[in-house]
Regions:
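Acyl-donor (CoA/ACP) binding surface of acyl/acetyltransferases
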Residues: 1-27, 56, 60-176
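A short helix-loop-beta-strand connector motif used in the catalytic cores of GNAT acetyltransferases and
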Residues: 47-58
Length: 176
């Protein structure tokens, strides 16, 4: 799948070094809820799962052909049972923050979710201090549902709340 500046595609083994580059950035992993990778072998193990998955796509910058992040629609049956729903997740190399890349990728993935997959609702969340993620979510038409208190425990031991959002197919179509 292509956008103006990006190619959203399956992960491949050639992505290992670019993946490790952003997975090892301390300000990237913490915002996604995982410990930054210290060894490339950690990234290799995760990359094998990404390659096998149909839920996650690599984000490649067209101009440089560099893998700069990932985006995906993940199964999430914790909150909505019997509803065609997915949870949006994404991560971006911090060198590419602030240029609209993630909003561009999310917009393309929402189209796939609602038009191709016929989803009824897509959810997304961010930790309260992650203002950049909030902006991506709101720019793409998600509505704030509320705060999920004590949502998860980080690798540091810190207990995190989660700001929860969603967008329905109807809202998506009206926005377009």
């Amino acid at each position: 799948m292509e956008t103006k500046r990006l190619i959203l595609r399956k992960f491949a083994q050639r992505d290992l070094f670019d993946f490790f580059e952003y997975a090892s950035q301390s300000d990237v992993g913490i915002n996604a809820g995982w410990k930054p990778h210290v060894k490339i072998s950690e990234s290799f193990e995760i990359l094998k799962n990404f390659i096998a998955s149909d839920e996650i796509l690599g984000i490649e910058e067209k101009a440089s052909h560099k893998l700069i992040g990932s985006v995906g629609l993940h199964l999430d049956e914790r909150f909505r049972r019997g509803i065609a729903s997915r949870e949006l997740g994404y991560v971006l190399n911090h060198d590419y923050w602030g240029h609209g890349y993630m909003s561009e990728a999310v917009s393309a993935v929402l189209y796939v979710g609602f038009v191709n997959m016929h989803l009824e609702i897509i959810t997304c969340g961010h930790y309260p201090k992650n203002d950049r993620s909030r902006k991506v979510i709101e720019k793409n038409g998600f509505k704030y549902e509320g705060l999920i208190r004590h949502h998860s425990r980080l690798y540091t031991g810190e207990i995190m709340d989660l700001c929860q959002y969603s967008i329905t197919r109807k809202e998506y179509i009206q926005k377009k």
